[in-house]
A protein has these predicted regions:
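Juxtamembrane helix-loop-helix junctions in multi-pass membrane proteins
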Residues: 23-50, 172-196
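Cytoplasmic-side transmembrane-helix entry/capping segments in multi-pass membrane proteins
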Residues: 10-17, 70-81, 125-138, 156-160, ...
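Membrane-interface interhelical linkers
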Residues: 1-19, 51-78, 151-154, 184, ...
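Structural signature of hydrophobic alpha-helical transmembrane segments
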Residues: 39-52, 92-110, 155-169, 213-227, ...
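C-terminal transmembrane-helix exit sites in multi-pass transporters
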Residues: 90, 109-134, 255-274
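Juxtamembrane helix-loop boundary signature in multi-pass membrane transporters
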Residues: 1-16, 114-164, 168, 281-310
Length: 310
């Protein structure tokens, strides 16, 4: 999601990435723990409670207010609305599916992103990418098929469709970020998304919000706080290590979701779900490693061309 700077400390970057996916999994568990709270309301708490943490971080980094200046409010608004829809669908799906299954379906995001980047940014689809995409899509189908086999009117099928829709919209949001990365700072992307998602969540008020009890309020506030921390940890990890180095460690969230789902929600992952998740994870890792290889080759070609001009 964020453009990487030259790697300075891969070990620290990996540690921060593992920390980020851990707190994001905890955030999802907090949202799942309040099934009576509408998804839009949960999104509001997730977004607004993260804002103070993000603002403190921006000030500490010396990126406030200069770092949030933007050349295109419209692009941030579009990206923010798409990302907000992805968040809302994901939160809604958590009510109907086990936490490990939601996590596994979300891993489809980089797979879908390859397809969207080819359609929207004109990126070439080579054989390795096509094979990885096909593998990932088969994995997703294996995960959601048991839910869909009961019919689309089943709540679990609805949950699977919601989470898959969330993954697709998250991929679309990342394509927008990729297109903006040349002109917008990471600080601007983080800040404007948090602001947009906070405002977008208010549009769901007419559809019915509830007054949370103290326990629910604690989980909602906690989701926002750890979500803000996760965003900072994620951003910081990409500043310290290359995306290709960090990518495999994002899948640690699968381990945490299985552990938390079993201990907290009495959820036991099925063999088809684990097999499908393995295929999706394999596809994601192959895609990222291939991207890294292509990036290295492009850098090498630029160096050769530069030497030829000397």
């Amino acid at each position: 999601m964020f453009a990487a700077t030259p790697a300075t400390s891969p070990v620290r970057g990996i540690f921060l990435m593992i920390s980020a996916v851990t707190v994001f999994t905890v955030m999802s568990a907090f949202i799942k723990a309040v099934p009576n709270v509408p998804a839009g309301e949960a999104m509001f708490f997730r977004s607004i409670m993260a804002m103070p943490i993000i603002l403190i971080w921006l000030i500490w980094q010396g990126e406030w207010p200069g770092g949030i200046r933007t050349n295109s409010v419209r692009n941030h608004a579009v990206r923010g609305l798409v990302g907000s829809a992805a968040m809302g669908l994901g939160f809604a799906g958590l009510k109907y599916l086990p936490l490990p299954e939601v996590t596994a379906i979300r891993f489809a995001t980089p797979v879908v992103m390859v397809i969207l980047a080819a359609l929207m940014l004109g990126e070439r689809l080579r054989l390795i990418r096509i094979s990885a995409v096909a593998t990932g899509l088969v994995g997703v189908l294996i995960i959601i098929w048991p839910r869909l086999s009961f019919g689309l009117d089943n709540t679990e099928a609805l949950g699977a469709i919601m989470v898959l829709g969330s993954a697709c919209l998250a991929a679309l949001a990342q394509v927008f970020v990729k297109g903006m990365s040349g002109s917008e700072t990471t600080a601007a992307i983080v800040f404007w998304f948090s602001l947009t998602s906070t405002l977008a969540s208010l549009l769901t008020v007419p559809f019915g919000w509830v007054w949370p009890n103290p326990g629910e309020a604690a989980f909602l506030v906690g989701a926002g706080l750890v979500g803000g921390m996760g965003q900072i940890l994620l951003t910081s990890s990409y500043r310290l290590a290359d995306a290709g180095v960090l990518a495999p460690f994002t899948y640690v969230s699968m381990l945490w979701s299985v552990v938390i789902g079993y201990i907290w929600f009495d959820e036991v992952p099925t063999l088809p779900m684990l097999f499908g998740a393995a295929l999706v994870i394999l596809a994601g890792v192959v895609i990222v490693l291939r991207e890294r290889q292509l990036g290295s080759n492009a850098t090498a070609r630029r160096k050769v061309s530069a030497k030829g001009l000397q």
